[in-house]
Amino acid sequence: MSAPRILHRVARPVPSSISTITRLNRQFGTTALRLKDGSDEASPEVKAHRANQANKAPNQFVPNTTSTMTKDFVNVGQKPAPPEMLNSANPNYRPSDPYPGRIEHFTGGRQDNGAQKPELGVGEMEGITFKVEPLKRVGEELATKRARLLYQSRKRGILESDLLLSTFADVYLGKMNYDQLVEYDSFLDENDWDIYYWATQDSPEEISPSTPKEDTITETWKESGAKSGEWAQTIGAFRAAYRPVPSRWQNSEVLALLREHVRDKSATGFEKAKNKKTGGGGGLGRMPDVQVFNSGHIVHRRHVLRMLYI
């Protein structure tokens, strides 16, 4: 290296850390860099607000089955209170729920149940003064009833219920007697997600203590490596909370058959199927072919089912 270059490097000043920070700061704006010291604290109003929020009790848990439009819900003025203002409007408020023990179960015993409301029937909603009565058929022939129930089992509107009820109807609908058909007809008037969870979830007493008390996002799918099958990235990433079966379906023969159908078809989803030595069933697969019900036998066809009677 030549002597002039060496002298130039020695004479060049070394930039300090403060000048480097200032120079980098000037690349993005004209505001000078201000380092935090002991005097840089929040204003008294901010500290008072933080202390007020920290001393408040947690907001009450309100399940999705509790309506906020009823008269017993807390109001702020003339309107219902938003969820984040419940503890401010009434710290002692306890929401009412038609399912006994649901709030205590979801909160892990942190919150007691409020006033017990009667279970909602089919077509009933909280906060309304009328009831949406299901459509009843009178004088319907047996083959026509089976064809209609098959259509209602296949056209639910969500994929889970479509697969569950269409495969169930393919196996059991042709074998049901008249009383079972009437019960299945009433069962199909229930909410789709309720039917799905009633059929696929075990009661909390029959499964492990790790059953979630509320809908939770898990990390199991990250630890177990790649998954195979449809929607592989979502397997094990979500566990739904337990939905209790209402008293009107506690001893239902149709619901028992539907649960048995899930156990026979389940590969890994049902808790009891995981312990099967045979490895469980092969899953629901696809929607089966349409059955055409005649008076004495069943014919399988591949064409689209026409509505015989609604």
Swiss-Prot record:
Keywords: Chaperone, Mitochondrion. One of its GO terms (biological process) is tricarboxylic acid cycle. Residues 35-67 are annotated as: Disordered. It is found in: Mitochondrion matrix. Pfam families: Sdh5. Residues 52-67 have a biased composition (Polar residues). Residues 35-48 have a biased composition (Basic and acidic residues). One of its GO terms (cellular component) is mitochondrial matrix. This protein may be expected to contain an N-terminal transit peptide but none has been predicted. Interacts with the flavoprotein subunit within the SDH catalytic dimer. Plays an essential role in the assembly of succinate dehydrogenase (SDH), an enzyme complex (also referred to as respiratory complex II) that is a component of both the tricarboxylic acid (TCA) cycle and the mitochondrial electron transport chain, and which couples the oxidation of succinate to fumarate with the reduction of ubiquinone (coenzyme Q) to ubiquinol. Required for flavinylation (covalent attachment of FAD) of the flavoprotein subunit of the SDH catalytic dimer. Belongs to the SDHAF2 family. This is Succinate dehydrogenase assembly factor 2, mitochondrial.
